[in-house]
Amino acid sequence: MSETTAMARDEAGAIGPGRLVLVVGPSGAGKDTLLRLAQAACRDDPGIVFPRRIVTRAASADEDNVAVSSDEFRRAREHGEFAVQWEAHGHSYALPCDINDDIRAGRAVVANVSRTVLAALRHAYANVVVVAITAPPDVLAQRLAARARQSDGNIAERLSRSVDDASAQADVTILNAGSAEYHSRQLVRVIKGEGWQE
């Protein structure tokens, strides 16, 4: 099971006034593709930040993560460098503490996280929006098989995991079964607080 740790709230309460936009969903849903397109669309907006996750697995061309060893991750955690950290599929993941400064400055921070940290982050931050990105099971299976990433492990096992929890906790759900450009525009509207339906 996943281990999660979230940083304590500010002395005055939950960290704000900026927004924390959390993207969750099953492997193969296209989260990283939509995030990459959304980041490109928001690149000229200084009020929107896409922090790089710290991860204890090899870097991937599809993700903009900071790859570190398990020892480096442990040392950073012990030095309080993470706003939140979690374990999933045999790897450690974290978001840097810098996101707290961005949130306090009123910026929107957008991050791909595990659904296991949602409750802790909703408690620690004043303005949280959870976006669940999903796709039909056959599409998920095709995408996982096509990317053939060793860290994906057993595809059937991944697909058998329930994604209902993430959708139930989501403020917005994007069914990513069509054009990535179309769905990334939906995500950008959510990030900017404009709603998402066309």
What are these regions (language model features)?
Residues V110-S114, H123-R147:
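Conserved phosphate-donor/acceptor-positioning beta-strand/loop module used by diverse small-molecule
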Residues A146-E198:
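Small-molecule kinase domains that catalyze NTP-dependent phosphoryl transfer to phosphate-bearing small molecules
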Residues L34-L35:
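Post-Walker A alpha-helix
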Residues V23:
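Hydrophobic anchor at the beta1->P-loop junction of P-loop NTPases
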Residues V49, R53-V109, V113-R115:
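ATP-dependent small-molecule kinase phosphotransfer cores
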